[in-house]
């Protein structure tokens, strides 16, 4: 099953649009920021990282349980294609720690560390 289709998020809160590449411990994908979005772009960059991270480690749904050291250095403009890269830093059973970056045209515009928790006993 395509995990992107299994995400419970719908437009305008669905940030993950396509996977560029994926390994066991990291994933890189993208989302397109449009002028019609209702959510602030800064929130969506962090949300995109979390959505891709969830697809990397969970078969069932998970949720953001913490955000650390998140830094956004540039705003997203309508039409920007944001490339997201997320890696698993630690596995604590039902909680995972990730590091993520977001870039536009090869320039990093956001980075952060965050935690996702499984909403199911199976991950």
Please name every model-derived segment:
Residues 1-39, 73-77, 89-97, 104-107, ...:
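Non-catalytic linker/capping segments at the edges of enzyme domains
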Residues 2, 8, 52-53, 58:
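Hydrophobic alpha-helical segments with strong N-terminal bias
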Residues 3-5, 62, 68, 101:
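Short, functionally important structural connectors and interaction interfaces within domains
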Residues 34-56:
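Compact, glycine-rich, soluble single-domain proteins
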Residues 53-83:
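Hydrophobic beta-strand-centered segment that forms part of the acyl-chain substrate-binding groove
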Residues 86:
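NTP/phosphate- and nucleic-acid-binding module
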């Amino acid at each position: 099953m395509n995990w992107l289709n299994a995400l419970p998020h719908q437009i305008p809160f669905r940030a993950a649009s396509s996977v560029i590449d994926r390994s066991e411990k990291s994933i890189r994908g993208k989302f397109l920021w449009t002028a019609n979005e209702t959510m602030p772009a800064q929130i969506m960059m962090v949300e995109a990282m979390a959505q891709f991270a969830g697809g990397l480690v969970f078969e069932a749904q998970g949720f953001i349980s913490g955000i650390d050291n998140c830094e956004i250095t540039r705003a997203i403009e309508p039409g920007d294609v944001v490339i997201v890269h997320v890696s698993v830093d630690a596995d604590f059973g039902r909680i995972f720690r990730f590091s993520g970056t977001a870039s536009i045209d090869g320039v990093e515009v956001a980075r952060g560390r965050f935690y996702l928790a499984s909403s199911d006993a199976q991950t």
